[in-house]
């Protein structure tokens, strides 16, 4: 009986060791996969932004813009957060601003480095007329993703609503450098005209 007990104990230890080894391999491979996924995500964005700047016409630019938005809305490592963002966006589009705000805030809590979560919350705050809070979230969005033309045009819209036309113009000028065919930059001449009139 003593001999059998030792054998059972030995087999148990082997099983535990195999389980620990499996767990270590699993988590290490997950980390590698996540890192690879994020690397792929960043590389695709880099390519799309080059294509966006070099687009020859509006139709070509719109296709690239959609690709960029698809990547922005996709968390590079966590599908669950992607699903949450989709839910919050749907609620926001349906006018459920308070619920959307809570969801976006929860995503930010879980991953404060995801620029699109900040941008979505900035958007819902804009819709709620909470301009100061929206501007704070836009600032954070641009710290994480300086090329975020959606955040720049959104900030320009807030400044237009606040009649701070020079700030609006500055943001749209930055947008044009990143995305020359952006529909938002079409109002640059109007803003310049308003500012010229104010100077007279």
Predicted regions and their residues:
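N-terminal leader/linker segments that initiate helical-solenoid repeat arrays
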Residues: 32-82
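Canonical tetratricopeptide repeat
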Residues: 86, 120, 154, 187-188
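TPR alpha-solenoid repeat register
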Residues: 117, 151, 184-185
């Amino acid at each position: 009986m003593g001999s059998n007990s030792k054998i059972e104990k030995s087999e148990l230890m082997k099983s535990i060791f195999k389980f620990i080894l499996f767990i270590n391999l699993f988590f290490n491979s997950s980390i590698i996969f996540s890192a690879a996924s994020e690397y792929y995500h960043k590389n695709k964005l880099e390519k799309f932004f080059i294509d966006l700047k070099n687009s020859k016409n509006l139709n070509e630019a719109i296709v690239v813009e959609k690709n960029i938005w698809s990547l922005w809305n996709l968390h590079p490592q966590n599908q669950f957060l992607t699903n949450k963002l989709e839910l919050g966006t749907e609620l926001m589009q349906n006018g459920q601003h308070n619920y959307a705000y809570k969801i976006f805030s929860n995503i930010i809590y879980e991953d404060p480095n995801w620029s699109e979560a900040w941008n979505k919350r900035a958007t819902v705050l804009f819709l709620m007329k909470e301009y100061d809070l929206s501007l704070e979230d836009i600032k954070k969005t641009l710290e994480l993703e300086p090329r975020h033309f959606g955040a720049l045009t959104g900030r320009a819209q807030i400044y237009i609503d606040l009649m701070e036309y020079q700030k609006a113009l500055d943001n749209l000028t930055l947008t044009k450098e990143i995305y020359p065919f952006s529909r938002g930059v079409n109002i640059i001449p109007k803003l310049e005209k308003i500012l010229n009139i104010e100077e007279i």
